[in-house]
């Protein structure tokens, strides 16, 4: 190995050159790498924070869904109860209405029956009076004879009771 050989000095020069170039570039490269590392760490932290936020949001959303499902089922139950109450009330009202109409119809029929019976009695009495009056006129009895005959007839059933 000869120290005066140009390849040797070329190699030494190249090593010195590399050292001189690497020395200032080392800081720039390290700073750049540190910046990239910090950037990656920051992104990882952001991703972890987003993951935690998403998990929290998922929990919160599930809790809200459960609350809403509970509320929905409660509302359905309440509406079913209200519907049943309304149906019972309306059924009761209809039954009362029908019972009232039935009693009104019965009362109307009884009134009509009473009226018809009264009319028939009145017609019958009028007809009997008319027939009796015609009979007495045909027999040509006087009022005193009518009274006398009526008195005699009223005594007759009593005598009949004594005879037996």
Curated annotation (Swiss-Prot):
Annotated TM spans: 7-25
InterPro entries: ATP_synth_b/b'su_bac/chlpt
Entry-linked CDD domains: ATP-synt_Fo_b
One Pfam short name: ATP-synt_B
Annotated signal sequence range: none
Localization, UniProt: Cell inner membrane
GO CC annotation, single: proton-transporting ATP synthase complex
Record-level Gene Ontology MF annotations: proton-transporting ATP synthase activity, rotational mechanism
Keywords recorded for this protein, A-Z: ATP synthesis, Cell inner membrane, Cell membrane, CF(0), Hydrogen ion transport, Ion transport, Membrane, Transmembrane, Transmembrane helix, Transport
Location (main, coarse): membrane
Topology in membrane: Single-pass membrane protein
Protein family according to the UniProt entry: Belongs to the ATPase B chain family.
Alphabetized NCBIfam families for the sequence: PRK06568.1
Function: F(1)F(0) ATP synthase produces ATP from ADP in the presence of a proton or sodium gradient. F-type ATPases consist of two structural domains, F(1) containing the extramembraneous catalytic core and F(0) containing the membrane proton channel, linked together by a central stalk and a peripheral stalk. During catalysis, ATP synthesis in the catalytic domain of F(1) is coupled via a rotary mechanism of the central stalk subunits to proton translocation. Component of the F(0) channel, it forms part of the peripheral stalk, linking F(1) to F(0).
Quaternary structure and interacting proteins, as annotated: F-type ATPases have 2 components, F(1) - the catalytic core - and F(0) - the membrane proton channel. F(1) has five subunits: alpha(3), beta(3), gamma(1), delta(1), epsilon(1). F(0) has three main subunits: a(1), b(2) and c(10-14). The alpha and beta chains form an alternating ring which encloses part of the gamma chain. F(1) is attached to F(0) by a central stalk formed by the gamma and epsilon chains, while a peripheral stalk is formed by the delta and b chains.
Protein name, entry field: ATP synthase subunit b
Gene name for this UniProt entry: atpF
């Amino acid at each position: 190995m000869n120290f005066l050989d140009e390849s040797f000095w070329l190699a030494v020069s190249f090593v010195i050159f590399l050292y001189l170039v690497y020395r200032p570039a080392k800081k720039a490269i390290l700073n750049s790498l540190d910046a990239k590392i910090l950037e990656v760490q920051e992104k990882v932290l952001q991703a972890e924070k987003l993951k935690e936020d998403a998990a929290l949001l998922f929990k919160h959303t599930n809790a809200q869904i459960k609350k809403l499902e509970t509320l929905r089922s409660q509302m359905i139950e309440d509406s079913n109860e209200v519907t049943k109450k309304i149906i019972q009330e309306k059924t009761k009202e209809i039954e009362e209405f029908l019972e009232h109409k039935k009693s009104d119809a019965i009362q109307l029929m009884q009134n009509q029956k009473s009226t018809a019976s009264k009319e028939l009695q009145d017609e019958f009495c009028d007809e009997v009076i008319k027939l009796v009056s015609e009979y007495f006129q045909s027999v040509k009895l006087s009022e005193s004879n009518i009274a006398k005959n009526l008195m005699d007839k009223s005594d007759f059933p009593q005598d009949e009771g004594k005879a037996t």
